[in-house]
């Protein structure tokens, strides 16, 4: 295991989002099953933490941007700052939706169509953000998720207000279409990983990468699909499972997503104005972490390392040479021993 290779591509933004969603997905079924009697404002605490960190991080980043104009010419600083502003705008609309949801569940005084109104604005904004992101090669997971689900948001709001009386299985038709596409992606990765496993022209690193991607997509999509099917049957009263048992597959998907953040490049460097990779920033703030970060473990090449150590130990040792001018001791590397050239003899004629 190489900690440096593990953390150098770490994406803290996505890790924070998945961790907050995981904690929220644990508290919500406990509240729905009546195990805890907390207010929904408390159940949504992980979501509030997520949005608070987004707002604070963007505010600090904007302050650093305004006070240091020279930073604006560093690489893609301008593109990353604009991407941060777009993400903050989408998060503010999502925060408005979540506040309205909590208020509607606690008091029940307004229509669900009004609650979902921020999501109806998020979708066109996300479409514009996707167009901009594709032009600048940005990560677009959240924007794509919000833009393709506009029809799903409308169906759910109409069903909750009892304007339509469709079963939930029909209400979630847009979601089934999206999951079908994700299943095709999983099948694509499985086929390519099998082809790479049977190919002799592919290096082991590429083969391992494709197999890992296939396993990751399987453990994300399949449990997510199981969760959605169980939830729909529970809402339609086709089963009486507890919400905790229904949410277990979702926990597996979120845990897998959290694990994938350690190998996903990306992340905006302007959050909190750090202007560098998150792990590099941590190493500068906490220098003692470098001692662990410089250690690597390789359990698969012990024999080869022993052979190398033996060859190094058998190399001839060279006595140190004393330099008169520099007054330092110079020792040649034992692994790079070069015999001295022979003395040149020139025979002069009589």
Curated annotation (Swiss-Prot):
InterPro entries named among the record's database cross-references: TM_Fragile-X-F-assoc
Residue spans crossing the bilayer: 16-36, 41-61, 81-101, 111-131, 168-188, 211-231, 240-260
Main location per the UniProt record: membrane
Domain of life assignment: Eukaryota
This protein's UniProt keywords: Membrane, Transmembrane, Transmembrane helix
Recorded family membership: Belongs to the TMEM185 family.
Name the record gives this protein: Transmembrane protein 185B
Cellular component terms (Gene Ontology): membrane
Subcellular location per the Swiss-Prot or TrEMBL entry: Membrane
Membrane topology of this protein: Multi-pass membrane protein
């Amino acid at each position: 295991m190489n900690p440096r290779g593990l953390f150098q591509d770490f994406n803290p933004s996505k890790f924070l989002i998945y961790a907050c969603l995981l904690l929220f997905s644990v508290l919500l079924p406990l509240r729905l099953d009546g195990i805890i009697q907390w207010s929904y404002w408390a159940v949504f605490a992980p979501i509030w933490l997520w949005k608070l960190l987004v707002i604070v991080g963007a505010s600090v980043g904007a302050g650093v941007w305004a006070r240091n104009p020279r930073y604006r010419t560093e690489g893609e600083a301008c593109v990353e700052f604009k991407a941060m502003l777009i993400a903050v705008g989408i998060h503010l609309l999502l925060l408005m939706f979540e506040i309205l949801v909590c208020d509607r569940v606690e008091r029940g005084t307004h229509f669900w169509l009004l609650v979902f109104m921020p999501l109806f604005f998020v979708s066109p904004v996300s479409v514009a953000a996707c167009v901009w992101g594709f032009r600048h090669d940005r990560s677009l997971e959240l924007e794509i998720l919000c833009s393709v689900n506009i029809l799903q948001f409308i169906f759910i709001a109409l069903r909750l207000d009892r304007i339509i009386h469709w079963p939930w299985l029909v209400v979630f038709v847009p979601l089934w279409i999206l999951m079908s596409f994700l299943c095709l992606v999983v099948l694509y990765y499985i086929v390519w990983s099998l082809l790479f496993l049977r190919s002799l022209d592919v290096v082991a690193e590429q083969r391992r990468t494709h197999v890992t991607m296939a396993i990751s997509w399987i453990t994300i999509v399949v449990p997510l699909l199981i969760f959605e099917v169980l939830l729909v049957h529970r809402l339609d009263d086709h089963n009486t499972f507890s919400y905790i048992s229904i949410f277990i597959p979702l926990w597996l998907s979120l845990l897998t997503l959290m694990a994938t953040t350690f190998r996903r490049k990306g992340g905006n460097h302007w959050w909190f104005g750090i202007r560098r990779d998150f792990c590099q920033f941590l190493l500068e703030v906490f220098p003692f972490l470098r001692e662990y970060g410089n250690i690597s473990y390789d359990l698969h090449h012990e024999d080869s390392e022993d052979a190398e150590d033996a060859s190094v130990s058998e190399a001839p040792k060279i006595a140190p040479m004393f330099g008169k001018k520099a007054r330092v001791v110079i020792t040649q590397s034992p692994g790079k021993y070069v015999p001295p050239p022979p003395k040149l003899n020139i025979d002069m004629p009589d």
